[in-house]
Amino acid sequence: MSEPIQNENVESNVADAADIAAATAATEEFTNTIGDAISTSTEEETFEAAPAVLDGPIWTVGRRKRAIVRVRMVAGSGEITCNGRTLEDYFPNKLHQQLIKAPLVLLGREGQFDIHANLGGGGPTGQAGAFRLAIARALNAYNPAERPTLKKAGFLTRDARAVERKKAGLHKARRAPQYSKR
């Protein structure tokens, strides 16, 4: 068997104020040298992109739940057409209209483009969410310099939530039959 190691200077393991001050100074000096190696400039480099010119239609696709929306965006007066009908006729709910127009309003481009959409599948909320994603993707394709603004607002993120499938032996996706102890 091995004998326990004897520490002759047990009392020297206790740090005094001078040791703590020296360690703090060394730590600060070390972190300052690390900080110098990493460029942490607070000024963000912004590149002014040339004014984007829309030479042809921009085609994009947006999906949400079961809805799929195909959008064709062209330069125009701000008319939005959904399956041959106006936006107000197709989406009478003002909340859905605001949801769809949100990327255009954020970038201040409400009356700049004509948007023609082919909507299919899902319900009104899913179609509105898919429409918003398709418009945001079209605006991103038109001017990639505005991508950070759209990304920060969450307009370029595809909402992956969908209905969970029903499982065998359960009433619904997670609803189990009532438990009976006896």
Curated annotation (Swiss-Prot):
GO terms for cellular component: cytoplasm; small ribosomal subunit. GO terms for biological process: translation. SUPFAM superfamilies: Ribosomal protein S5 domain 2-like. One of its GO terms (molecular function) is RNA binding. Keywords: Ribonucleoprotein, Ribosomal protein. PANTHER family: RIBOSOMAL PROTEIN S9 (PTHR21569), SMALL RIBOSOMAL SUBUNIT PROTEIN US9M (PTHR21569:SF1). This is Small ribosomal subunit protein uS9. It comes from Corynebacterium efficiens (strain DSM 44549 / YS-314 / AJ 12310 / JCM 11189 / NBRC 100395). The gene is rpsI.
